[in-house]
Amino acid sequence: MQIIIDGHKVPINPRVSKDLLITLKSIARSLHWGILYDTNRETVYINTKSASVPVPPHERPASSPAEAESNRLAGKTICIDPGHGGSDLGAIGPTGTIEKDNTLAIALLLCDKLEKNGATVIMTRETDRDVSMPDAETEVELGARVDIANGADADIFISIHNDSFTNPTAAGTTTFHYGHPESIRLANCIQKSLVEGLGTRDRGVRFASFFVIRYTKMPAVLVEVAFISNPEEEVVLASIDGRYKAAESIFQGIVKYFKV
């Protein structure tokens, strides 16, 4: 296993073990460092300058000139809401992976992809922080996210989350809407694309009364990408490859929704 701190490789190659990963994550978080384990390359990335999850630039897949120059989403304003953040950790996986880190990493990758295709992207948060204020009441925090989307007059709103359940075998992808026909159509586009892209179980498109999709004034969905409580899906959510696939899949769902 490699350990890379602030872009520099540490001259040791310890054997991968669950205990070592948990220890590294515990140390990093106690010092407010960002940490990410790439399962495919057996590499731990640590960012000592920020608590944000590191996304190594050299790991980013090169976009083709056509993708980089595309304007097919020009004129579209898309609000992306990385679930949780700051004092709100969200759910925690079996090995200590934190939901707020996963959602932010996926959202940032999605933002980059959307902007390369001409969209104007509004992020409710771009770092590991509370959107309103630390330890605010839930409705105040969620209301701040809704206000950002409504204030930007966004065309669509997408809130990104990880699912969790007490039974670790629970698995799959679900996309929620609040019943508006266009929200249902957006949910179907994203759900189909995510299931195909990640190869997860299709848990379907469902109605829910979540605050952020109930009070937004545009087509809105809340996406549960996969179960962080499921050991296998936790690995996908925490990996660079899994996060890219999730971001790319949501992007393709958005493209299908706008029919561009």
What do these predicted ranges mean?
Residues 190-203:
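Proline/glycine-rich low-complexity loops and linkers
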Residues 138-140, 202-207:
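Short gly/ser/thr-rich secondary-structure transition/capping motifs
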Residues 60-188, 196:
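Catalytic-core regions of hydrolytic enzymes
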Residues 8, 49-51, 83-85, 126-127, ...:
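Solvent-exposed coil/turn segments that connect beta secondary-structure elements
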Residues 159, 166, 204-260:
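Active-site-adjacent mobile loop/cap segments within catalytic or ligand-binding domains
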Residues 24, 28, 104-107, 111, ...:
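Extracytoplasmic/secreted envelope proteins and their assembly/folding machinery
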Residues 1-78:
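Primary recognition of N-terminal secretory signal peptides and signal-anchoring hydrophobic helices
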